[in-house]
């Protein structure tokens, strides 16, 4: 009734009308076609759509026609897109994050302690802990309630190049320049188990088995400049299997949610492996130079596991519940972002291009994304998987449609290479760190700069946004770790 009433109320005015049909992102139709005035606003569409969905609590929704969001009215969007309106017009509806992350605006702590550059920073899955890896060979944990140093972890004998949290937040893996991997307990700062050795050159990336696949968080995969990928049993402290096939250094690695491992290399290829036995499924080819970076559409759900950012409290907690409960929560969060189709993968290269793939299904790319004028440093899917952001040496960040790879916008403001980017948990904001020594926070929907954050004395190598939305952490050449809040 409410749907009919909202449509009828608009019908009393003498306005051009259109026949429209709602459908979700997967193409599932909602209700039957109905006619609306051409000047209908998103608020009115929201009333009609929520009535058709029969939700107890109305959902915040966004509406799209041919990939363009309806911002002021349907008519305005149609004019800008020059859309044919003779037949039924499909309007795609998408639920939006119910919670909001506010932009960080100021540096609340400048934490000294590292004696060389900070190479990586990473918040734990709930945002309770912050870890950093440095050229001074140490890993450090920082106390976020007091924003002070907590533990200094010594054990590596060379630069710590890569760090990665287990999705239950109970272990941190770190990899260094001499090929060694160590595991740490964030609550004590002590090393867990023995060093994992076997790689002959430095560690380029670490990726844990997803929580919904194994709530014990027992297995971690590593990639190395030696061209191999290894899967480790962290409980037994041994290498479970070695995946070989790349002809050059493996630059990045992802452990996907559907039982696949993805590795990208300087040999210009991405290889897709079956995680449980190491069988090579397919090789993705297309890049004309080194593949530097890749991301999965499900990365954020995999990283945060059973943690739901919408339920975050002011003081981050550990995850509670039995292993089975955590596994089920992680699986439902993964399935929600994965949607109907398999997870998508985006890769970025020294050849200035990105490719979008559906690696579980096909070795042909879904899209080739061009526009950057220099090599691509990092690429990241938004937590809701709808937008891809890429950071480049051309000083820009570009936004792309997460389903089609279509170009959306360029974010300009940095005056030197953009090294790293991180999304807020609600997918509305993006923070970037640059060689120009600044961080910048961007409003993704408005496609403009929200806040400029100077403060570092030199290049910013690493940046992360806590999954609870409270803080941004950054580190770089000035050896200083900075925490930013709203």
From Swiss-Prot:
Residues with PTM Phosphoserine: 80
Under Gene3D superfamilies, the record lists: YVTN repeat-like/Quinoprotein amine dehydrogenase (2.130.10.10)
Known partners and oligomeric status = Associates with the pre-60S ribosomal particle. Interacts (via WD repeats) with uL18. Interacts (via UBL domain) with MDN1 (via VWFA/MIDAS domain).
Chain spans, region Ubiquitin-like (UBL) domain: 15-97
| A GO cellular-component term linked to this record | nucleolus
State where it is primarily located. nucleus
To which protein family does this belong? Answer: Belongs to the NLE1/RSA4 family.
From the UniProt record, list the WD repeat ranges: 113-152, 155-194, 198-242, 245-283, 326-367, 371-410, 413-452, 455-486
Q: Where can this protein be found? A: Nucleus, Nucleolus
Pfam family, any one: NLE
* Keyword Ribosomal protein applies: no
Top-level taxon in the UniProt lineage = Eukaryota
What is the name listed in the Swiss-Prot or TrEMBL entry for this protein?
Notchless protein homolog 1
> Mind listing the GO biological process terms from this record?
hematopoietic stem cell homeostasis; inner cell mass cell differentiation; kidney development; mitotic cell cycle; negative regulation of mitotic cell cycle; Notch signaling pathway; positive regulation of canonical Wnt signaling pathway; regulation of Notch signaling pathway
So what does this one do?
A: Plays a role in regulating Notch activity. Plays a role in regulating the expression of CDKN1A and several members of the Wnt pathway, probably via its effects on Notch activity. Required during embryogenesis for inner mass cell survival.
Q: What PROSITE patterns does the record tag this protein with?
A: WD_REPEATS_1, WD_REPEATS_2, WD_REPEATS_REGION
Q: Which UniProt keywords apply?
A: Notch signaling pathway, Nucleus, Phosphoprotein, Repeat, WD repeat
Q: Which SUPFAM superfamilies match?
A: WD40 repeat-like
